């Protein structure tokens, strides 16, 4: 299977790339700082690009069987990488006719019960609301899509 990993140079992304390669998948690692990754595996392709660049993201996704998003960012809510990055990924996946995505989200978007998310609970930690809301927005882009997630 040919995979692309967004957020490939983060703590989680590095492990996702390693595991995917170990399992025999061809992997495209996408990010601003992909030079940090060791390019010793012939099944690994490093793609330097910006998450918000529509053309770069489209070109990277094209020809893949699935997308993995482990995008990170700051916790203050000012960094919109999670939400706007997911919006661009979803848009470019549709254009490239790639339907399968696995995306990492934060604890706030886990269900408290059938109709309520943890982030909507009164006792949800206030310091995590900004990043939690970023995860929620990213999740909403996935929910609104016709992708297989």
Regions found by a protein language model. Name each.
Residues 3-25:
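N-terminal Rossmann NAD(P)H-binding glycine-rich loop of SDR-like oxidoreductase domains
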Residues 6, 30, 70-71, 101-106:
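SDR active-site strand-loop-helix element
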Residues 30-35, 50-51:
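N-terminal Rossmann-fold cofactor-binding loop
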Residues 35-43:
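Short loop/helix-cap segments at secondary-structure boundaries that form the rim of catalytic
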Residues 42-65:
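Conserved Rossmann-fold cofactor-binding substructure of NAD(P)-dependent oxidoreductases
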Residues 74-101, 130-137:
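NAD(P)-cofactor binding segment of oxidoreductase domains
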Residues 76, 108-113:
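Conserved catalytic-site region of short-chain dehydrogenase/reductase
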Residues 140-149:
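Conserved beta-loop-beta element that borders a ligand/cofactor-binding pocket
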């Amino acid at each position: 299977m040919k995979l692309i990993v967004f957020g490939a140079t983060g703590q989680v992304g590095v492990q996702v790339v390693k595991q995917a390669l170990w399992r025999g998948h061809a992997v495209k690692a996408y990010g601003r700082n992909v030079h940090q990754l060791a390019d010793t595996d012939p099944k690994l392709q490093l793609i330097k690009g910006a998450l918000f660049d529509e053309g770069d993201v489209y070109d990277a996704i094209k020809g893949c069987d699935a997308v993995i998003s482990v995008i990170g960012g700051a916790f203050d809510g000012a960094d919109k990488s999670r939400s706007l990055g997911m919006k661009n990924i979803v848009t470019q996946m549709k254009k490239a006719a790639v339907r399968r995505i696995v995306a990492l989200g934060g604890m706030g978007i886990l269900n408290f019960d059938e109709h309520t998310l943890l982030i909507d609970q009164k006792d949800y930690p206030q310091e995590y609301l900004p990043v939690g809301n970023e995860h929620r927005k990213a999740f909403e882009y996935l929910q609104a899509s016709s992708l297989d997630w």
